């Protein structure tokens, strides 16, 4: 009887989800209620977690709670600590959820809400959550080893070193893209910058409070920190209007880049408990709380999605990013469906904290579903805005100009009606001087979120507060990832350099730490600066590189997972990883090839470099450049991007070839050859 009731409930969930999808897909030019998208997403996540993740856990991985985890075997109170699964879920989610799920879906909305919705949901169920689950599992079975170390074990030393180099390159690009989003959101925004700056002393106070005043009172200090942040948002409006402090906190992009680089360096070398840990707690509560609150707000407000299901820009002519739906929609959405960055987290701190093997499913598969839900919320925030407002915020100034009158005229010619008065009014409502060309996705998410919450309360009087609350929320999302990512990048640099200079590999050496941090910060700081001074806007060139590198790293993680399944003699289940691997590999390689060699300057790095090089030779200034120096910057940026893209492709192909030979050897072997740590069973540990 119980099985019948359970089956009926899940059948009902499936039917409701199918009906919601039908409402989204079959709209004929009519505005669709955003509630249907929330319902479809929740139904998909529920079914995928209940059935597909259980199948993987029970049949493919055979998770066994009798096996001691690395946290139990090496419990040292420092790196290896058995952690409650709910606490670890929050830690893991805070680490993986950066700007990607917020930015990618918003940019992808230029093609309409339906293509992005389908990939976010299908991609996370069959690829993204599978990758996170897989890497966390194989790392836990190998004492929490990193992705590069596992590749070295399973594929050979050469493939391992290549993987480590590729992972470091991708990490630098990821951090630079995240930091550039922060710069784009806070440049010339005194209210936003003051609010974010205020979180630093707040986090320091929280760190001291938890360590010396009230140790262990995480919930207590998190509430205090949250209240202090709300006060900072409120007071930020006064700061922006102040004749002295307003200009003081009004920083241009280049200055803000240097400030962020210095902050990243200091945050990376400070003790974790002083800044990173308290910000981690705050961001976890903020991330999960705000996303759930936003979903509830959508249910109550029931806003209509004004963006068409499929727009005219699926042909690749869109102003937000260039390129056709395949492959560029998939690399643009990136983290909302699958992220290679997660493979670094899932083989970093998280496997050293897992308390039971059965928790891997909840933490690995479940946290990625939560991040995908963040992507759905971002897509909704972009889609509930008038398309004219959306394109005004996300199109480069080179296309729409710098005045509301010019922007309105250009966007109207695209078939999306928006008036200068509307653009000026929205800027005034959110407390900004202008909203034009605020690329990067963060401002668009903030305006969309403020719009939804204002509809819940049926008042637009608080639009400015909710806008800056959303900016704070996003910045916490991003800065948490930048903080943790810079520290992880430092470890990767030290590991690589330590091969030649062993002293630098010592994480307890101040010289090694400072040297590694300097290289890491200089790496991502360089690309942020290039993005800021790029006359094309930076986002348009850096984010495709971020997406390609990120997706290639994900395909590499899945390739490693496929090899491990063959070496475990689980080849009958290898389709679980082979299918997403094949799709990701083809997509990312196609995107990489097009970004390097495409004949259109709006798409191909080399074509764009050639276009502006020719202009320099002829002494002709080509818009949006305003000088020959601007054109030289564009040429240099495109040449660097093409070289990096080619490097990522070479790394992925090298790993695929190494995997092919490793699988051949595994098939010839009669016994499993996977390099797992010997199983210590809980009963045996208790008797010994």
What name fits each language-model region?
Residues 1-15, 47-102, 284, 323-324, ...:
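Membrane-interface "cap" regions at the ends of multi-pass membrane proteins
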Residues 22-28, 33, 79-142, 153-157, ...:
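Membrane-interface helix-loop-helix modules in multi-pass membrane proteins
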Residues 31-50, 108-138, 148, 191-203, ...:
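Extracellular loop-to-transmembrane helix junctions
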Residues 53-81, 107, 117, 121, ...:
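Flexible loop linkers connecting adjacent transmembrane helices
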Residues 90-96, 123-143, 147-148, 152-221, ...:
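Helix-loop-helix module between adjacent transmembrane segments
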Residues 154-172, 364-373, 439-441, 459-470, ...:
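Loop-to-transmembrane helix boundary motifs in multi-pass membrane proteins
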Residues 188, 207, 211-212, 227-258, ...:
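Hydrophobic alpha-helical segments and their helix-loop junctions in multi-pass secondary transporters
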Residues 298-314, 369-448, 484, 529-534:
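Extracellular/periplasmic helix-exit of transmembrane alpha-helices
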């Amino acid at each position: 009887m119980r099985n019948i009731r359970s089956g009926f409930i899940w059948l009902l969930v499936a039917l409701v989800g199918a009906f919601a999808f039908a409402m989204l897909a079959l709209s004929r030019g009519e505005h669709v209620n955003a509630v249907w998208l929330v319902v479809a997403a929740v139904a998909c996540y529920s079914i995928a977690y209940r059935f597909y993740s259980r199948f993987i856990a029970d049949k493919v991985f055979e998770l066994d709670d009798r096996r001691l985890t690395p946290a139990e075997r090496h419990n040292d109170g420092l790196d290896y600590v058995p952690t409650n699964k709910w606490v670890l879920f929050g830690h893991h989610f805070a680490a993986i959820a950066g700007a990607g799920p917020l930015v990618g879906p918003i940019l992808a909305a230029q093609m309409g809400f339906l293509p992005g919705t389908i990939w976010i949901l299908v991609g996370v169920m069959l690829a993204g959550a599978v990758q996170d689950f897989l890497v966390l599992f194989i790392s836990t079975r190998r004492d929490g080893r990193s992705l590069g170390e596992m590749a070295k074990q399973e594929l050979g030393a050469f493939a391992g070193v290549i993987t480590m180099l590729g992972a470091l390159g991708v990490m630098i690009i990821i951090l630079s893209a995240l930091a550039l989003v922060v710069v784009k959101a806070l440049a010339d925004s005194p209210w936003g910058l003051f609010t974010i700056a205020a979180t630093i002393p707040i986090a320091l106070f929280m760190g001291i409070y938890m360590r010396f005043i009230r140790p262990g009172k995480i919930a207590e200090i998190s509430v205090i920190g949250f209240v202090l942040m709300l006060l900072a948002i409120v007071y930020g409006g006064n700061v922006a209007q102040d004749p002295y402090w307003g200009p003081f906190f009004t920083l241009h992009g280049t200055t803000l880049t240097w400030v962020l680089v210095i902050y990243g360096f200091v945050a990376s070398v400070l003790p974790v408990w002083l800044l990173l840990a308290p910000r981690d707690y705050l961001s976890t509560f903020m991330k999960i709380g705000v996303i759930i609150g936003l979903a509830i707000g959508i249910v109550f407000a029931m806003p209509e999605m004004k963006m068409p299901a499929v727009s005219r820009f699926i042909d690749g002519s869109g102003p937000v990013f260039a390129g056709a739906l395949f492959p560029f929609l998939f690399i643009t959405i990136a983290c909302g469906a699958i992220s290679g960055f997660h493979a670094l987290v899932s083989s970093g701190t998280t496997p050293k904290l897992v308390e039971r093997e059965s928790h891997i499913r909840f933490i690995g598969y479940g946290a990625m579903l939560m991040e995908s839900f963040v992507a759905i919320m971002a897509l909704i925030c972009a889609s509930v805005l008038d398309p004219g407002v959306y394109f005004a915020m996300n199109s480069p100034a080179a296309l729409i100009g710098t005045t509301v009158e010019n922007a309105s005229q250009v966007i109207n010619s695209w078939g999306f009606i928006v008036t200068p008065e509307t653009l000026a009014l929205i800027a005034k409502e959110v407390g900004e001087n202008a909203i034009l060309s605020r690329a990067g996705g963060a401002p668009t998410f903030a305006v969309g979120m403020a719009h939804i919450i204002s509809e819940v309360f049926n008042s637009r009087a608080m639009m400015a507060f909710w806008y800056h609350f959303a900016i704070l929320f996003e910045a916490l999302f991003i800065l948490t990832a930048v903080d943790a990512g810079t520290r992880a990048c430092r470890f990767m640099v030290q590991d690589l350099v330590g091969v030649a200079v062993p002293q630098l590999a010592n994480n307890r050496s101040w010289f090694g730490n400072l040297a590694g941090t300097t290289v890491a910060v200089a790496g991502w700081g360089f690309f942020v600066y290039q993005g800021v001074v790029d006359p094309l806007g930076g986002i348009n060139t850096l984010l495709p590189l971020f997406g390609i590198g990120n997706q290639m790293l994900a395909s590499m993680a899945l390739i490693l997972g496929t090899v491990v399944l063959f070496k475990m003699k689980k080849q009958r289940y290898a389709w679980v990883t082979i299918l997403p691997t094949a799709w990701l590999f083809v997509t990312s390689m196609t995107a990489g090839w097009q970004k390097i060699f495409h004949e259109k300057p709006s798409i191909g790095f080399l074509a764009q470099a050639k276009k502006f090089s020719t202009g320099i030779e002829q002494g002709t200034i080509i818009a949006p450049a305003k000088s020959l120096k601007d054109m030289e910057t564009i040429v240099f940026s495109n040449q660097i991007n093409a070289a990096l893209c080619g490097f990522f492709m070479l790394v992925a192909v090298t790993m695929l070839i190494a995997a092919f030979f490793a699988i051949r050897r595994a098939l010839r072997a009669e016994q499993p050859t996977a390099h797992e740590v010997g199983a210590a069973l809980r009963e045996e540990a208790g008797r010994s």
